[in-house]
Amino acid sequence: DTVRRVPPVGIAISESVRQELSAEVKALETNLAEARLRWSRNPQQLKHWADIAIFGKSVDWALRYREIFKTNEVDSARLQLKTAAERLQALDKGQAPWTEIPGPSVGGYVSRIDGSVQPFGLVIPKGWRPNSGRQWRLDFWFHGRGETLSELAFIADRMKNLGEFAPADTFVLHLYGRYCNGSRFAGETDFWEALDEVKRRYPIDENRLIVRGFSLGGASAWHFAVHHASQWAAAAPGAGFSETA
């Protein structure tokens, strides 16, 4: 009883709101399961199903584990479920516009660790066009510590904000890394899996990979810079601890 809970318990929401969101999550899960059967013979559709599933999971977990920390996160939950429904409709038509429109976006992949869907944020550069024939620089941004950084909050931020750095002609991958663990343990594996997913989707120049982060994210950047130095063109850790060597 004397140990402080991390993350803390979220705010109370009305039972009507809880039932509303829970019903929408259940409907999304049913619709997505049916869609996956329709897409089973079309790899181009099936490969994007996790881009939809991340929204249902984020809302489900926020409700299940009481991780709604601000009143405006209820609206974020509604927006994410609406976005999931729109993506499902688009993918039914063989379209995935969120993977092509420049600016901030979110995607997902299935983790080899436990089969869960995991979210990532991605900033698509303005100059990018499909089949352009060029390779692109990729920067990574590791987030700092945030006790209320649920998947719901992470996705909400990554849907609308470019982030701390958005260099020109550069993709920027924002890692969630399973909350705030400094990209250790499962968070470290998530880094490599998210990188693999982005490389499958976009022509990334492996000679121009840069790791960045601040605070706990600086510790993450330092960790990868030290242990995998040959992988990066540069590293920019800020205000992170350096006991990873």
Kindly label every feature range from the protein language model.
Residues 42-70:
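Amphipathic, non-membrane alpha-helical rod segments
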Residues 220-224:
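Hydrolases whose catalytic domains are alpha/beta-hydrolase-1, hotdog thioesterase
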Residues 1-11, 65-136:
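A domain-start/cap signature at the N-terminus of enzymes
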Residues 30-33, 37, 60-68, 86-93, ...:
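Sec-exported extracytoplasmic/periplasmic mature domains
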Residues 1-52:
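Amphipathic, heptad-repeat alpha-helical segments
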Residues 230-243:
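A conserved short beta-strand
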Residues 133-202:
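Active-site machinery of serine-nucleophile hydrolases
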Residues 127-134, 183-216, 226-232:
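Gly/Ser-rich "nucleophile elbow"/oxyanion-hole loop immediately N-terminal to the catalytic nucleophile
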